[in-house]
Amino acid sequence: MRRVRPLVALLAGLVSTFLLVGAAPAPAAGAPAQPVQVAPAAVTPQVEPEVEPVAATPLRVASFNVRCANCSRNDRTNKREKNWEVRRTKVISQIKAEKVDVIGVQEASPGILKGTKTSQFEDLAKRLGEPYQLTNTYRYGCARSTSYKSCTKVDNGASADVRIIYNTERLELLDQGSKQLDKEKATSGPRFLAWAIFQDRTDGRKFFFANAHTEPGQSKAKRALRKRQANLIVSTIKANNPDNLPVVLVGDFSSTKLTSANTVYDVLMKSGLVIDPLGNTKKQKSTKKATAEKLTNVKYFTLNNFKSKPTSYKGYALGAHIDYILVSKSIRVLEYKVVLSVKNGKFSGVIPSDHNMVRATILLP
């Protein structure tokens, strides 16, 4: 006969243990039923996917001294210099051909063009057409901004013949302003810094753009004035750029590495605010210090004075530049170009100005 008592006893013990540990005790007679305790299900934490930063899109910036209209009419350099009404077509075609996103122009006068009611800078912007637009449309910093006569000064951001024009499809203007760079009246008219803060519509990046034209001349007094103007450029940019956005500074600084003193350049380099992507320091001959990744026509002097052919210097791979594009160290410069139309070593067609436009393609950080 088979023995089953030990097995029965074992099963009884297991049932008893289950009732004690895994099951709630039965309520007393007449007592309300107790809720059954259910262990919560394990929750898998949600991990947010890493968002890749949007890659920067190449941006084209430029500087162009377009030669004042009245200068061509009243103080012509030579027979190759044409009136503004002839030159402007070439100025506009070069800006468009270079697909510039933002440009600082100098000598785009607020004075009225002969036989019109339009100033030179207004004429340039109008003929460039959409999507180009001025950052500031006031002619003068006066209560009646259309005329300098009987001027009651106001700060409306006007900047005389120093102007910024930008591509509205690519850039959004966030802020703008100006600063006069000479308390005393300069012999050739007041000098200004114009500035603007932009946001790139393609990737959301912001940057600070500034354009200046400092006092020309190589006398001791002129050099001293330019030094004061350079220091004012630095302090104005810092005061209006509290977020320390990357800076692009362009302009005609009225001296070169070959002049007795390259005052503005030296002050700007010492400030640490910007660097020169050409590395075009005093008497520099080679391109070994350049940080720009591609160099185009940089051997040519940016001042052409309406000569028949562009000026270069024997033994100098980097020309003497009077027009500059300087950038924050964090900005990558893909190309730096001196823009000119040359055929068989000579200027081709109408020479747009006594200066050659300079253009850089950059990547913002």
Predicted regions and their residues:
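Structured beta-strand-rich core segments of catalytic domains in phosphoester-bond hydrolases
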Residues: A108-T214
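Active-site neighborhood of phospho(di)ester-bond hydrolases with catalytic His/Asp-centered motifs
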Residues: G104-Q106, T135-Y138, V248-D252, I275-T281
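Metal-dependent phosphoester-hydrolase catalytic domains
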Residues: K238-V247, S255-P365
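N-terminal, active-site-proximal structural segment of metallo-dependent hydrolase catalytic domains
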Residues: R2, V21-R127, C142-S145, V154, ...
